[in-house]
Amino acid sequence: MKSIIIASLVALAIAASPALDRTFSPKSEYVYKFDGLLLSGLPTTFSDASQTLISCRTRLQAVDDRYIHLQLIDIQYSASHIPQSEQWPKIESLEQRELSDELKELLELPFRAQIRNGLVSEIQFSSEDAEWSKNAKRSILNLFSLRKSAPVDEMSQDQKDMESDKDSLFFNVHEKTMEGDCEVAYTIVQEGGKTIYTKSVNFDKCITRPETAYGLRFGSECKECEKEGQFVQPQTVYTYTFKNEKLQESEVNSIYTLNVNGQEVVKSETRAKVTFVEESKINREIKKVSGPKEEIVYSMENEKLIEQFYKQGDKAEVNPFKAIEIEQKVEQLEEIFRQIQEHEQNTPETVHLIARAVRMFRMCTIEELKKVHTTIYTKAEKKVQLVIETTLAVAGTKNTIQHLIHHFEKKSITPLRAAELLKSVQETLYPSEHIADLLIQLAQSPLSEKYEPLRQSAWLAAGSVVRGFASKTQDLPLIRPASRQTKEKYVRVFMQHFRNADSTYEKVLALKTLGNAGIDLSVYELVQLIQDPRQPLSIRTEAVDALRLLKDVMPRKIQKVLLPVYKNRQNKPELRMAALWRMMHTIPEEPVLAHIVSQMENESNQHVAAFTYNVLRQFSKSTNPCYQQLAVRCSKVLLFTRYQPQEQMLSTYSQLPLFNSEWLSGVQFDFATIFEKNAFLPKEVQASFETVFGGNWNKYFAQVGFSQQNFEQVILKTLEKLSLYGKQSDELRSRRVQSGIQMLQEIVKKMNIRPRVQQTDSQNAHAVFYLRYKEMDYIVLPIDMETIDNVVEKYVRNGEFDIKSLLTFLTNDSKFELHRALFFYEAERRIPTTIGMPLTISGKMPTILSINGKVSIELEKLGARLVLDIVPTVATTHVTEMRFWYPVIEQGVKSLQSARLHTPLRFESTVELKKNTLEITHKFVVPENKKTTVSVHTRPVAFIRVPKNQDSEYVEAEEKTISHSQYQMSTEEIDRQYETFGLRINAQGNVLSQWTLPMVLMTEQDFEFTLENKNRPVEFTARVTIGNLEKTDLSEIKFDKIFEKEFDLENNESENRRQYFHKMIREIQSEQGFKNLITLKLEAPQQMYWNTELRTVCDKWIRMCKVEMDARRSPIEHENKEWTLRTELLAARPQMPSSLRQLREQPHREVQLALNAKWGSSKKSEITFNAQLEQSTEQKKFLRNIEREYKGIPEYELLIKAARLNQVNVVSEYKLTPESEYTFSRIFDLIKAYNFWTVSEKRVQNEDRRVVLQLSVEPLSRQYMNMTIQTPEQEVELKNVRIPRVVLPTIARRAMFQQTWEKTGATCKVDQSEVSTFDNVIYRAPLTTCYSLVAKDCSEQPRFAVLAKKINKNSEELLVKVVRREEEIVVKKSDDKFLVKVDGKKVNPTELEQYNIEILGDNLIVIRLPHGEVRFDGYTVKTNMPSVASQNQLCGLCGNNDGERDNEFMTADNYETEDVEEFHRSYLLKNEECEVEKDRISEKKNYKNKWNREEKKSDYESSSDYESNYDEKETEKELVKKTLIKEFSNRVCFSIEPVSECRRGLESEKTSNKKIRFTCMPRHSKNARRFLKEAREQTVADLVDFPVSFVESVKIPTACVAY
C-alpha cells in the first residue's frame, strides 16, 4: 500500500514539473521573426485598405525554467493603401517608413518575463521604457503564452478520457491575455509530427477587460437589445504550431467589426505571428531589467494619464502632452482658425477643422489657453471668436471650462452667451468632480445672482456633470467611480440649494439639478419630499420626475416608493398620475401591474382611472424593442379588466412607435397630458421623442414639457388688471352687482357656510416650460405673477398701454450674426488589440451653423410690414471611425456622411386695413446673383498618418476613398437641369438606385442641388383679402331643382314637405341677408398665377346660404388655355324644433344641399350634386315609437337624440373628360378594394352619367356604416363597415350647447326626492317647502347660487331661485307656463333674453350662470358646469365637482360626513317664509346613498329595514325594481322599464303577466358592457332613449314570502 502511495506522489510531482510543460530550454537563446499587420477597411476582400506591416527579430534567452529575457532588434515598418488579401502582404508592396532613433531605442530596450505552466505570469520592463512600447512588447510575449494542458482539477471526466487519447483535446479555462482575463477555449490537434494548439477568446465571459468608453452616459439600458444588438463585435483566435516539442510558429488573428442594423460596415484587423529562426547557446546575455512586476494584460496607464489630464486639468500629476511645445500648439490652432476665417461659407472642410481644434484644445494647459486667447482670440474677427468659444465648450476638459469661466467672470463673454456655452458643457465627454465644483462655484457667484439664465445653466450643467462620475451609466472611465462620501457631498449641495430657495421656481430648479445628477443616494431625499404632504404639490410632482434617471439603477425601489403614492386617494390626482407615469418606465413586473389595474377598477377619480387605462393600453401596443416584455405584461393584465374610460376624459397618454425589429432601430413619439378636475389648464403636458439605433436606447432624446400649479389665478388676475385700465364703472350695474352680492352673503350667513378658501395664493402660482435633451433638463422657463407684473408695468402706464415703447421696440432694425459650432453627439470606446495598439472606435457629428441677417418692422397708420433678410449656412459631418494609434503611426478607417446647406432668403409680410377690406400679403423673394446650394456626400475612407521626426508638427493623413464594389455598381449618375420661374436648377451627383443604411455607409455617393438666379429678384406672392359683411337681397338664391325622386319620403308626404320647404325659403328670402367676399391670389414669375374668389350670401341666422367659388390658374404642361373652376353650393337647413311635438309635426326635417362644379382648360368637366341629409328609416321609427309623453328636461334630452340626422342621399349627374372619369374610377376601385370583406356588387343597367349614393350611420353606437352606390353599370353595397365613433348632427335647438356639456361638462340633477351630483354620486334626499341649496360658488367672492324648494307640501312641482352677482331670479311653473321674476318684478317672455334667460319649447327654461347654466322644467333642476370649474369651491347638494366620489358629502361648514341626512340638513335654508317639514326630513327612508355598494348590500340583506305595520308597505318593501336582462349569442337585451323582483332571501308567492318592452344591442358594444355591469347593482336609468326591439310577456311577482 505504501509503495502505491509513493508512486502516486512521484507521478504527481512529475506532472506538476514545469520542465514537461515548458516551451524553451534553459541556457538557450532563440531567435524568432515577428511580423505584425494592421488592416483597416471594409468587410470585403474586393476593396483597398490601409495596411501597416511591422517586423523585427526577437532574441529570447531562457535563463532558467521560469524566466526568459527578450530584446527586439532589426525593427522596421511599412505602410500603404493596397487591396485586401487573406495572405500576408509582401514587404515590397508597401512603402517603407522611417522610424526615428528615439523611438527605435525605446523598442529595443530589453524586458523580462516569468512563465508558469506555459503562461506568462509576470513581466518586468526597463524603467526607461514608455507605456506604448511596453504594450508592443506584451503583444510578442502574448504569442508565447500557452497552456499546453488543462488544469487537472478543472478537467471533466470526458476531458480526462480524451487526455488518454493524445490525438485531440478540447477544454475551457480562464486565462489572462493581452485583451483581458477572459474565458479561453483550447483545441489540441496532432497532425503527423506537429502539434497544433488553437485557442479562441470568449469576450462575453471576461472577469476584467481593459477598455474605456466615453459619451455613452446619455443612453438607457435596453435589456432586450443587449441580446441581439452588439455594436462592436471582436473575434480573436490563436494558433500555435509545435514540432518536436519546440514552438515553430505562433499566430494570432483579431477582427473587430462595426455593425449597423445587423450588418458589418467597417472592420479593423490585426495579425501577428512569430516564426522560429534559430536556436543556440547564449553568447551575449540580454541585460537583466529590474522594473516593477506587471501583467501581460494590456496596460491602460497612458490612457489613464490622458483621462486624468482631461478631468483634473493642471492639477493632474502628469501632462501627457508635455512633449508638444506651446508654440507648436498655438501655430496649429492659428492655422486652423485662419482657414475657418477664409471660408466665407461653411463647408465640410470647416467642420473637419473644428473637430481638429476641439482635439487640440483638449491637450492645452491653462497657460497655453491664455496664450491662445491673447494671440488668436483677441485679434480675430467676430466669427472666429464665436467659433473659438464654442469649440472650447465642446472640448469640455477641466482646463477649457476653467478658461471659459474666467472670461465669464471678466464679462469678456456676455452672461447670455455664457449661458448658451454651458449647454455644450453639459455634454462633456470627461465629467469630473473638479469640473462640477467649478460649475457650482459659478452658479453661486455674484455674477450668476445678477443673471438668472447664467445661474440656471450653471446649476443644470453641474447636475449633468455630476451624473457623469457619480451615477451608474454606460460610460467606462479608468478613474475609480465616486465614493459614497462624494455622492453624499453633492446631494447635500443640491439639497442645500433647494432649502435656501425662496421661490417655487428656485426649488424646481434645484430638483431638476438633482434629477440631472441621477445620484442613487438622492432617492432618500426625494422620497421625503414626495411623501411630505406639507410640501407644495408642484414640488412633490417635480420630486417624482427627478427619479427618472434612477429607473435602471433601482427600479424596485422606485416602484416601492411610487406605488403607495399612486394608490393613496388622499394625494392629488396629478401627483398620482405623475407617480404612475414614472413607475411605468421602470418596466414593472406583473404583480405591480396587477396592483395598478386593481386600483384603476376601484378608482373614484375618473381622470386617474382614464389616464391609467390609456397608459397601460399604449404600452401594451408598443413595438419598441425595449418595451417588449412590458407590452406582453400589460396586454395580459388588460385582458382581465372590464374598465372602460369615459370619452370626455382629458388626461391621457399616447404613443406613436415606428420600429424595425430586425434592425433594432426606430423612433417613438410620446404625448401625455395630466388634467385636474378643477383646472382649466393642464397640470402637465409632455411631448417626447426617443430613439433606438442598433440597440442603443436614447429614452429622452428630446422632450418638451409644460407644468403648472394654480396658474389660472395668474391669468385671471392679469386679465382683471388689464380690464381695469381705461374703463369707467357703470353706476347702475354697480348697484345691481352690490345687490346680488348682498343676497349671496345673506345665504352664506343663514346657512353658516364656511368659504372654501383656496389653499395656495397667487404668489405660489406658477408655470414652467422646459426642454429636456438626452435625458438632461436643458432649459427651464418659469412664468409667475412677478414676471407678468414686470411685463405689464413695462408697457402699461397710468392705466393705458404705452404704445410708443412697444412701437420703439418693434421698429428697431436688428442686424444679427450667429455662429455656433457644436457636436450633436460624440462617443468613444477604446479597446486593446493583440498587436499592442489600442483601437479607438468613435462616432461624432461636428456641425457649424452660421446665420447672418437683418429683421425690420415698419408700422404705418393702418398696417404693418415685416421684412426678414437672412443667409443661413449649415455644414455637418457624421464620422464613424475605427483608429489604431502608435507614436510611429496612426491608421484607421472611417465612414463620412457630410451635408451642406446655403440658402439666401428674403421674406416680406404686410398687413393693411383698407377702406372695406383687410389685406394680408406674404412675399418670398429669391435674391438676384445668389445661389442656393444643398449638397450631400458619403464615402468610406481608409487613412494613414505618419508623423515626422518632430512629434509636434501636424502631418495631414494620407487618405484613400474605398467602397464596396458590388454596392458601388448599384449607383447611378444624375445630371439634370431645369428652368422654372426664371430660376436655373441643377441636380447632379452619383447616388444608389436602391439603398439601405449599411449600403450608404459602404459606398461613395455625392449629390448637389443648386438653385441660381442670375436675373432680377424672383418673387412669389400670396395675397389674401377679406371684405366686410354687406347687406344684400336674398332673392337671388334659387332652389329650383333641389329635390330628386330618391329624396321622396314614405306615406306620400313628399308634396307636403316640398310645399313647406319652399314656403320656408320664401319667408327667409323676405328677410335681410349678408354677403362677404374673400380673395386669394398666388403669383409667381413667368406669368404663373392662381386666383380664387369666394363669395358667400347668407341670412342672419345662417338657415340658407349660397357659396360661390371661382378659381383661375395659368396653363401648365400641355394646356394652351387658362384653367378655370366655377362652383356654386346652395344649402338650407330646416327649422330647429325645441320639443318632440314640434319635431313630429314639422313636415321638413332634412338639410338640402346642391352643388354644381365646372372645371377644365380646353375641355370642361361638369358635375352636379343634389344631397339630402336626413333620418334613416330606423331613426324615424324610433321617433314614432316614443309613446310616452315626455316633458321638460327628459323631453329635451330625448329630442337631441330623436332629431339626429344619420343618413345622406346624394344624386350626381356628370359630364367628365376621359382623364377625370379615369381618376374617379380609380378612387372608386380603391374604396372597394379597401373594404373587400364587406362589399358586394351586382351588374345593373341604370341611367347613364348618373350616380346615386346612400350612406347611413347606425344611430345607437355610431360606429357602423352602410353605404350603397349605384352607377350606370353596377350597384355596390358596403354593409356594417366599422368606423371611428362619429358625432351625428341634430336639428334640435341648442343641440350644440347640449352636446358640448355632455362631452366636456359636469351635470347635476335634483328633483323632489333624488340628487345626482356633479361627480355622478346618486343619493336620495327630500326637498321641502324651505329652500335647499342646490349649488353655489362657495369661494370668498361668490358669484352665484342655485336654490330649490317644493311649491307646497303635497305638490311635486318645484320653485327655483338663482342668485347671480347682478340679480335674483325666481322661476316657477304655473298653468303649464313659466312665471319669471327678477329682483321681485315679473318679466315678460319677450324680455327674458336681456337677463340671459331662454325658454325652450313649452316645458324648459334655461338660466345662464357666469360659468354654466341652470335648466328647469318645473319638476327637475339640472345644473351644468364646466368639468373644470371654481377650483374645488362649489358646495351644495350637488357636491364639489372635484372628480372624487369619496368626498361628496361636505357639509356647509366644510366638514365631511357619511350621514346623508346631516349633509342635507346643512344646506336647508330655514326662515320665516317657510315651515320646516320635520317629519319628511327626519324619515330615514328618504335618505339613501345609492352609489355606496356596501350600503346597498346591507340594505338588501337587512330584514329589519323592511318591517312595517301595513301590508301594502311591507309588500312594496319586499319587491325591488331591477332591469331584466335576456342574453343571446351575439346580442344582449334589456327591459326598458324596470321589472319587479323579490328581494334576496325571498321567493315569489303571487305573480301576474305583464308585457315588457326590450331594447337590444351588440354584445361587444360599449353600452352593452356598461349596462350589464350597472344592472347587477341597480336599475339602468338610461334605457328609455333606446329603440324598442321586441315586446314580450313576462311573469312578475306581486307578493313575496320568506321560507
Curated annotation (Swiss-Prot):
Domain of life of the source: Eukaryota
In its UniProt record, a GO molecular function of this protein is: nutrient reservoir activity
Residue ranges annotated for the Vitellogenin domain, each copy included: 24-685
- Gene Ontology cellular-component terms listed: extracellular region
Give glycosylation sites per the record.
1266
Keywords, comma-separated and alphabetical: Disulfide bond, Glycoprotein, Secreted, Signal, Storage protein
Q: SUPFAM superfamilies of this UniProt entry?
A: Lipovitellin-phosvitin complex, beta-sheet shell regions (SSF56968), Lipovitellin-phosvitin complex, superhelical domain (SSF48431)
Q: What happens when the gene is disrupted?
A: Simultaneous RNAi-mediated knockdown of vitellogenins vit-1, vit-2, vit-3, vit-4 and vit-5 increases life span, causes accumulation of neutral lipid and an increase in lgg-1 foci in the proximal intestine; however, does not affect fertility or pharyngeal pumping rates. Expression of transcription factors pha-4 and daf-16 are increased.
InterPro entries for this protein? Lipid_transp_b-sht_shell (IPR015819), Lipovitellin_superhlx_dom (IPR011030), Vitellinogen_b-sht_N (IPR015816), Vitellinogen_open_b-sht (IPR015255), Vitellogenin/Apolipophorin (IPR050733), Vitellogenin_N (IPR001747), VWF_type-D (IPR001846)
Disulfide bonding pattern of the chain: 1308-1438, 1330-1474
Q: Which residues form the signal peptide?
A: 1-15
Predominant subcellular localization, coarse grouping: secreted
Q: In which tissues is it expressed?
A: Expressed in the intestine of adult hermaphrodites.
Q: What Pfam families does the database record attribute to this sequence?
A: Vit_open_b-sht (PF09172), Vitellogenin_N (PF01347), VWD (PF00094)
Looking at the record, the residues that make up the VWFD domain are: 1306-1475
Localization: Secreted
Question: Briefly, what is this protein's role?
Answer: Precursor of the egg-yolk proteins that are sources of nutrients during embryonic development. Together with other vitellogenins, may play a role in modulating life-span, acting via induction of autophagy and lysosomal lipolysis.
Which protein is depicted?
Vitellogenin-4
